[in-house]
Amino acid sequence: MAKRKQGIFGRIWFVAWRFLLLFVIVLFLFRFVPLPTTSFMLQSQYPVKHTWISIDKLPTYMPLAVVASEDQRFPDHFGVDFTAISKALDQYDDGDGLRGASTITQQTAKNLFLWSGRSFIRKGLEAGLAIGLETLWGKKRILEVYLNIAEFGKGIYGVEAASQHYFGRSASKLTMNQAARLAVLLPSPRTRNPNDLTFYLRERVDWVERQMQQLGPDYLKPIIE
């Protein structure tokens, strides 16, 4: 009986480490080539609009806008912002529910491999994958992929598809204000429209633009260039 259990666990371990090795190899390859799809795109109930664009073709304020809005500590953390997680857990203990606290790297990992919803299991997987992305890809690639796979509307993925859909132009020609208007869609992209902003979202756009100015045009230069 003991030998049979050892044999079963041995086979499970053999399959698991081979799967992990294959996953790492595939992840490493996607450091250099555009990703054809993501978990969220495959799960989408809407027709998918998605066009890849190199981060080098984007105006510098497009990545700066999403960093200012979503994760200002992006250049400094290693995929997981433990300070933000600690605050979220304190709020959870106070009965406020499980909140986000996800970094851009974690959001990239979630969109690529996981599912929507909030649970400790998904958060744990998300954090582990985020550290893997930081290790294998680096900041510039993570930000490039995020800008290309984040959802900006019903079935609209990536800043190029979003810019074409909402503004009728390539993301390479976005203005600073348009970049900020796209950035504020990210928490709830299916219920927001950059051309029909509520008072709250207009205030949010103004806040993002102020944050962009405070961070400065060179804030992301060390990781993008």
Curated annotation (Swiss-Prot):
Record field: catalytic activity: [GlcNAc-(1->4)-Mur2Ac(oyl-L-Ala-gamma-D-Glu-L-Lys-D-Ala-D-Ala)](n)-di-trans,octa-cis-undecaprenyl diphosphate + beta-D-GlcNAc-(1->4)-Mur2Ac(oyl-L-Ala-gamma-D-Glu-L-Lys-D-Ala-D-Ala)-di-trans,octa-cis-undecaprenyl diphosphate = [GlcNAc-(1->4)-Mur2Ac(oyl-L-Ala-gamma-D-Glu-L-Lys-D-Ala-D-Ala)](n+1)-di-trans,octa-cis-undecaprenyl diphosphate + di-trans,octa-cis-undecaprenyl diphosphate + H(+)
Gene3D superfamilies on file: Biosynthetic peptidoglycan transglycosylase-like
Q: Which GO terms describe its cellular component?
A: peptidoglycan-based cell wall; plasma membrane
Membrane topology reported for the UniProt record: Single-pass membrane protein
Pathway listed for it?
Cell wall biogenesis; peptidoglycan biosynthesis
Give the molecular function GO annotations.
pentosyltransferase activity; peptidoglycan glycosyltransferase activity
- In which broad location class does this protein mainly occur, judging by the first location in its UniProt entry? membrane
EC number, as in UniProt: 2.4.99.28
A single GO BP term for this record reads:
peptidoglycan biosynthetic process
Which keywords appear in this protein's UniProt record, sorted alphabetically? Answer: Cell inner membrane, Cell membrane, Cell shape, Cell wall biogenesis/degradation, Glycosyltransferase, Membrane, Peptidoglycan synthesis, Transferase, Transmembrane, Transmembrane helix
What residues form the membrane-spanning segments?
Answer: 12-32
Q: Does the keyword Transcription regulation apply?
A: no
Cell compartment(s), UniProt: Cell inner membrane
Q: What function does the entry list?
A: Peptidoglycan polymerase that catalyzes glycan chain elongation from lipid-linked precursors.
Say which family it is in. Answer: Belongs to the glycosyltransferase 51 family.
- Name of the protein in its database record: Biosynthetic peptidoglycan transglycosylase
